[in-house]
């Protein structure tokens, strides 16, 4: 699976999960053959209770989607992460995205033991999540090397922003599946060995993102994608993408849970401009890919 969408979690005005919008989003990904990642940072996982998260996983599984469903595993405590993995394995999910421990900044041995402890209780393929901007430390090369023989260590989502680190991961473990975790870096990371993209923008443009992944070296594609990335990065993810989804009526409301707020999005006037640009690009892609 080359493209996985880091799915948002839509909310109603009372801050309950908007399951109708969830269904709409997931079916839009299924239509294009894109897998989904639930309850990552884009899905505001830290703002949801365990009960809410389980309801979301159960609902997604009830839709009988013909695409992979990957579930995020929190990096807050080993007990919480282990209990969550055990709970999710009672549902027909396809794998896990395991976050590097946040805030504590462990050393190499602590990080190895953290991931190994979680991998040892799963019976699904797992993608380790390198996100130093949130975790405070990267996934070390020594960690990748030490875990490379684990049967459920499937890949890494690399959101570290370093092309060199992506190349190093592939050198340390050539059989590992590296997923680019930054929409704008897909062409460069693909050249360095990344085999897939875990995308935020594909929430709003699942078909266009699919084409972007298939044709990463088209200059026009990458320029537009970088413009979109620049826009969504003006605020903390997923503020911008929720605003875009609501503008396009892909979700009912642009509501986030605190401490995230839609009020931190300053430039909503650019929304129709970006939508029009993407519409024009989509028409060009339609001619190329058909």
Curated annotation (Swiss-Prot):
Pathway: Amino-acid biosynthesis; L-lysine biosynthesis via DAP pathway; (S)-tetrahydrodipicolinate from L-aspartate: step 3/4. It catalyses: L-aspartate 4-semialdehyde + pyruvate = (2S,4S)-4-hydroxy-2,3,4,5-tetrahydrodipicolinate + H2O + H(+). The record marks 41, 103 as: Part of a proton relay during catalysis. It comes from the Bacteria. GO terms for cellular component: cytosol. The active site is at 129 (proton donor/acceptor), 157 (schiff-base intermediate with substrate). Its EC number is 4.3.3.7. Belongs to the DapA family. Homotetramer; dimer of dimers. This is 4-hydroxy-tetrahydrodipicolinate synthase. It comes from Chlamydia felis (strain Fe/C-56) (Chlamydophila felis). The gene is dapA.
């Amino acid at each position: 699976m080359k493209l996985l969408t880091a799915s948002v979690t839509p909310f109603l005005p009372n801050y309950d999960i908007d399951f109708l919008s969830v269904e709409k989003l997931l079916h839009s990904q299924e239509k294009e053959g894109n897998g989904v990642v639930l309850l990552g940072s884009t899905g505001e996982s830290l703002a949801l209770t365990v009960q809410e998260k389980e309801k979301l996983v159960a609902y997604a599984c009830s839709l009988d989607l013909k695409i992979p469903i990957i579930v995020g595993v929190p990096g807050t405590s080993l007990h919480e992460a282990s209990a969550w993995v055990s709970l999710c394995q009672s549902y027909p999910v396809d794998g896990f995205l395991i976050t590097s421990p946040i805030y504590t900044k462990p050393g190499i041995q602590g990080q190895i033991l953290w991931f190994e402890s979680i991998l040892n209780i799963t019976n699904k393929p797992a993608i380790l999540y390198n996100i130093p901007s949130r975790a405070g430390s990267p996934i070390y090369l020594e960690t990748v090397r030490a875990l490379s023989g684990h049967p459920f260590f499937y890949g890494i989502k690399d959101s570290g922003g370093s092309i060199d680190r992506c190349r190093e991961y592939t050198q340390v473990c050539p059989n590992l599946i590296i997923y680019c975790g930054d929409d704008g870096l897909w062409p460069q990371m693909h050249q360095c060995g990344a085999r897939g993209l875990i995308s935020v923008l594909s929430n709003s443009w699942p078909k266009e993102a699919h084409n972007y992944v298939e044709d990463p070296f088209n200059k026009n594609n990458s320029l537009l994608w970088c413009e979109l990335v620049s826009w969504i990065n003006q605020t903390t993810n997923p503020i911008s993408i929720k605003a875009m989804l609501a503008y396009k009526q892909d979700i009912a409301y642009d509501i986030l849970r605190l401490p995230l707020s839609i009020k931190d999005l300053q430039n909503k006037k650019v929304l129709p401009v970006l939508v029009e640009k993407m519409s024009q690009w989509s028409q060009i892609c339609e001619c190329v890919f058909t």
